[in-house]
């Protein structure tokens, strides 16, 4: 087939008659929280690129944006990575304030600890409580993730510990290995995306674009009829008999 030439005749794609014909992807805003060196950045990059990168410079808070498909729905996904080492109880006020702004922005949360670091596990409950403090009236979904599940020889946190904490907080719990299993990482993010969609009542439908509807174009028969009426002599209708 020959390529289209702009110098010849071409067809215009139909313009939507109204805003209901134009669909925008859903906006999903997630935050990944947890102590330092638990693999938060590696999880995000693994999900978005399928690649595992083991060593990262200390994270200062990067925002990742990507269009992704989850169960056939296109999502405009934003994932906020957060610095590690933030302790809610004893951090500086400006640090806690920065974390609060991130929590306020996000709609769904991954709380990540490493199974090789018991202190990172202990940081999960205060983070969860801070989320509920910032979102007191919200059902914002939270998933607790035990990462580095491949390092069994260095395990400090048992699987049952993660399950028990999740049950106490009313959250889902998953133990994964970011380095060895892309599917598990993908499942975590996809499940959280679906929970956020359900929270906003957006499942199965797309958010409509806020564009001004254009007037409906008259069809050809209407144009012909109106043209004939304009050319025909005007005839005065007979008055009704009394």
UniProtKB/Swiss-Prot annotation:
In alphabetical order, the GO MF annotations are: G protein activity; GTP binding
Q: EC number(s) in its UniProt entry?
A: 3.6.5.2
Supply the alphabetized keyword list. GTP-binding, Hydrolase, Nucleotide-binding, Nucleus, Transcription, Transcription regulation
The record's listing under InterPro entries reads: P-loop_NTPase (IPR027417), Ras-related_GTPase (IPR051065), Small_GTP-bd (IPR005225), Small_GTPase (IPR001806)
Q: GO terms for CC?
A: nucleolus
What catalytic reaction does the record list? GTP + H2O = GDP + phosphate + H(+)
Q: Which annotated residues bind GTP?
A: 34-41, 81-85, 147-150
Q: A single GO BP annotation from the record?
A: positive regulation of transcription by RNA polymerase I
Q: Where is this region: Small GTPase-like?
A: 17-241
In what tissue types does this protein appear? Answer: Widely expressed. Down-regulated in prostate tumors compared to normal prostate tissue. High levels found in colon tumor and normal colon tissue followed by small intestine, liver, jejunum, ileum, bladder and aorta. Lowest levels observed in endothelial cells.
Which leading EC class covers this enzyme? Answer: hydrolase
Q: What is expression of this protein induced or repressed by?
A: Down-regulated by TGFB1.
Indicate whether Ribonucleoprotein appears among the record's keywords.
no
SMART domains (alphabetical): RAB, RAS, RHO
Subcellular localization is given as:
Nucleus, Nucleolus
Taxonomic superkingdom? Eukaryota
Please report which protein family the annotation says this sequence is part of.
Belongs to the small GTPase superfamily. Ras family.
Q: Which NCBIfam families match?
A: small_GTP
Function text: Regulator of rDNA transcription. Acts in cooperation UBF/UBTF and positively regulates RNA polymerase I transcription.
Assembly, in brief, is:
Interacts with UBF/UBTF.
Q: What is this protein called?
A: Ras-like protein family member 11A
User: Its encoding gene is what?
Assistant: RASL11A
């Amino acid at each position: 087939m020959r390529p289209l030439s702009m110098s010849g005749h071409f067809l215009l794609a139909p313009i939507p008659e109204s805003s209901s014909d134009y669909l925008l992807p859903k906006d999903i805003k997630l935050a990944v929280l947890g102590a330092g060196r638990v693999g938060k950045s590696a999880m995000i990059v693994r999900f978005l690129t399928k690649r595992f990168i083991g060593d990262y410079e200390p994270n200062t808070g990067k925002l990742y944006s990507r269009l992704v498909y989850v169960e056939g729905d296109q999502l405009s996904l934003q994932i906020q990575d957060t610095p590690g080492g933030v302790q809610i109880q004893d951090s500086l006020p400006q640090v806690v304030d920065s974390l609060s702004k991130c929590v306020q922005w996000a709609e769904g949360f991954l709380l990540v600890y490493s199974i090789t670091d018991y202190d990172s596990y202990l940081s999960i409950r205060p983070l969860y409580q801070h989320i509920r403090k910032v979102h007191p009236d919200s059902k914002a979904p939270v998933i607790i993730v035990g990462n580095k599940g491949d390092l069994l020889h260095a395990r400090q946190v048992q699987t049952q510990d993660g399950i028990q904490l999740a049950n106490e907080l009313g959250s889902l719990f998953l133990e994964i290995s970011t380095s060895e299993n892309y599917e598990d990482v993908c499942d975590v993010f996809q499940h959280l995306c679906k929970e956020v969609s359900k929270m906003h009542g957006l499942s199965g439908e797309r958010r409509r674009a806020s564009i001004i509807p254009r007037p409906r174009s008259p069809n050809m028969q209407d144009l012909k009829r109106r043209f004939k009426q304009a050319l025909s002599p005007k005839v005065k209708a007979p008055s009704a008999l009394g």
